[in-house]
Amino acid sequence: SAIRDFLISKGVGSWRLFTIFPVGRAASDPAMLLSSDQFRQVMEFIKDTRQQGKIKASYGCEGFLGDYEAMVRDRFFSCNAGITVGSVLCDGSISACPSIRPDFHQGNIYQDDFMDVWTNRFDRYRQREWMRTGPCANCKVFRYCRGNGMHLRNEDGQLLMCHWRKLRNQPIDAVVTEPTGT
């Protein structure tokens, strides 16, 4: 709350908060990642900060949060990487988002026409059914999260972290099936 109060005292109007996801150093150092209880505390902090109305706090585009969605964001979660967001990285790589690993790059502006890449590639981003594997195979909230953010997938496309399960203190491989007929 000291950081929040400092930002308010400086007249900052908006504050977007993120958490660390298990990539890079955080992949091999569990101390860098929040526990389920700590993650819920962050959501409660953002919710309380929003209710106070002194600064517009919101949670980043990390993943689907279930019941917290409307309390910590202005919009329902959607990973728009490769759908409405495209990026050109410093090396010329054409990606959807700078947080997404190189395995998902779609081209390079030094060899490819950006609009051609945008129009004719990015299928992996736009057609999400391939994500219905592993913990997402029969998950009851897949229709809302669509397999989570692309940056939360490893080089093989496997999910590294599920925010919805983390908030429920469930391991990523817990079976949370969707009722049949829905």
Give each language-model segment a name.
Residues 99-182:
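Flexible mid-to-C-terminal extensions adjoining Fe-S/redox cofactors in radical SAM and related proteins
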Residues 1-85, 90-95, 99-105:
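Radical SAM enzyme [4Fe-4S]-AdoMet core and its adjacent flexible, acidic
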